[in-house]
Amino acid sequence: MKQIRVELINTGTEILLGSIVNTNAAWLGNRLFEAGFRVGRVTVVPDGYAINEAMRESARRADIVIVSGGLGPTSDDVTREALCDVCGVDMHRDEHVAEWLKSYFERRGIPIAECNFKQAMVPDGAAVLENSNGTAPGLVMPASGSLPMFILLPGPPAELKPMVEHSVMPLLEDLADEDIPHLRVFRLVGIGESDLQELVDGSLHQVEGLEVAYCARVGEVDVRLVGSEVALKQGEARLRILAGAYVLAPAGASLEKAVVCHLAQQDLKAATAESCTGGLIAKRITDVPGASGVFEFGWVTYADRAKTEMLGVPENVLKRYGAVSEPVVKAMAEGALERSGADVAVAVSGIAGPGGGTPEKPVGTVWLAWAFRGGETRTEMMLYPRDRSSFRKMVSQRALAGLLDARRKEPVTE
């Protein structure tokens, strides 16, 4: 059975201006994938008659074209007219829809405006889809000749989603690919996108029928595998053999959730000592349900005096090396470990910017330390010259990733 080609068209000048995010495309793409369809292209056009050409172009490539938006009562809502133009048909007033519109407004005690009856105009040959949450009915024009099936949906997500679930999916289920592909996403930390691809790409592409894609995030890389269950099992096995040290567990979890799960499994408690991140590391840990079982204490020691009074960092070390230095961050981590009674402590001190940098310590410099009870303290320096928010997120990512190395030390027996 051939793969059904699906394209999405979203109308809305506000999307192109960046005033709103195109959540409809993301939701539809995911929902259609779950049902066995692959969206091949998404097109966004401004309100008005640009929709005509977009529909013509999609009609040349796709078997199903789904359009969202442009079904309202105003003059720039012209998706119905565009469908008539592309299909070469006229429109008629559907009296059933017109009566429904009247009752819709009457129930709300609002007089209906004449322009609202525009929404009762239906292209000849199209079927009407009921809208349970608004006034814009959806429309389905069956495939005919060289033209694909057109499905017209209202733009507001609160109207679009129920219509898709209740009307569109039952309509499409008989057309779906019988061999529905599966998706599995693995999140990795501690390795960059390019290095990861070099490490695993050749092996993964040897798996027949497996599609591989990479998505870089701040301090993380997602690997998306698409294919049959057999292909996914083979792909996952190869990924874990080659890059298992970087894969978060449980699969698909956020880094902070993975940290909490890891600490719980190891029966460890953690503490944090933060300067440049201002408590972000502690916040991310405590955002996870169950964090109370693994998180002991957190300090935000922004000033040098706080580092000395709260964490015991020696004044002479601060004066000699400066707050952003290996000796200071090491002392912060060890002080947090001692004062909290935790099993592992992470400390960070850096220059988030935009000011405060020097030739020796430019903006973006950060030192991190992880102190382990009964073990050696590990330190690391990073240079991440980005905006303040991205810098703080990246530092918190690296700090959390280091906590995944914490292990419960078994007592030594004679």
UniProtKB/Swiss-Prot annotation:
Pfam families: CinA, CinA_KH, MoCF_biosynth. Disulfide bonds: none annotated. It comes from the Bacteria. InterPro entries: CinA (IPR050101), CinA-like_C (IPR036653), CinA_C (IPR008136), CinA_KH (IPR041424), Competence-induced_CinA (IPR008135), MoaB/Mog-like_dom_sf (IPR036425), MoaB/Mog_dom (IPR001453). PANTHER family: NICOTINAMIDE-NUCLEOTIDE AMIDOHYDROLASE PNCC (PTHR13939), NMN AMIDOHYDROLASE-LIKE PROTEIN YFAY (PTHR13939:SF0). NCBIfam families: cinA_nterm, molyb_syn, PncC_domain, PRK00549.1. This is CinA-like protein. It comes from Akkermansia muciniphila (strain ATCC BAA-835 / DSM 22959 / JCM 33894 / BCRC 81048 / CCUG 64013 / CIP 107961 / Muc).
